[in-house]
Amino acid sequence: MEDKILKIENFYAGYGSLEVLKNINIEIEKNKITAFMGPSGCGKTTLIRCINRMHELNKEAYHKGEIYLEGESIFKMEPVILRRKVGMVFQKPNPFPHLTIYENVLAGYIINGIKLKKEERDRIVEENLKKVALWDEVKDKLYSRGTHLSGGQQQRLCIARTLALNPEILLLDEPTSSLDPKSTVEIERLLEKLKENVTIIIVTHNISQASRIADYVAFIYLGELVEYGKAEKIFTSPENKITEEYLSGKFG
């Protein structure tokens, strides 16, 4: 029996009069890769932004329903604490342009005013750059700008920055959509290794990517969760006709 780390219950969300998510109910498995899949505008990104409460940074945003992280309502947590537990990596690599590679890895600590001894800082930087297979590529230029790296390297740096805070869940919003094929493969291989220690939720409309790396797939359409289950079953014998049509390329 799988462990559930996240439970979304009777959840609705939107902006002003626009309802984006409608009655979402889903339980996310611990230390697995779950892909939120569906056509553009279906609500995938809104859903992951709700999971770490970035959604509510928009003044017009609203939600109702519950999201539980290991049994505790995320809406009763301090957002800063929640976002350490539930980290986010965005579609476009976004290392802080004014920070070095070294400082980018430590950005979560710097922003939150957490003081560390040099030995601890060095350990965190090396450990997390190694986790994303970037250490050997940058160890001799740690004090150059993160923005000087290639696109794929920048995205791995952003993942290292998120991992440095030891999150329980890693959210990724189309993390390879702006990368070349080689960098995409590197990120996918990385995620398969990382799931040993962190639960991964990835938003993608790339069906091939979801089939390569996901353990579980949630198909979202027009703001509703149409189908959810083990990836192999979703891809080989979907229960819903809309899921089947999406997977066969009839719309997207």
Which ranges hold each PLM region?
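Conserved catalytic motifs of ABC-family nucleotide-binding domains
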Residues: 166
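Short coil-to-helix segment of the ABC ATPase nucleotide-binding domain corresponding to the Q-loop/switch region
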Residues: 99-108
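Helical segment within the ABC ATPase nucleotide-binding domain
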Residues: 185-196
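Conserved ABC ATPase "signature" region
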Residues: 69-73, 118-140
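Catalytic Walker B motif of ABC-type/P-loop ATPase nucleotide-binding domains
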Residues: 170-173
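Conserved ABC ATPase signature
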Residues: 144-149, 153
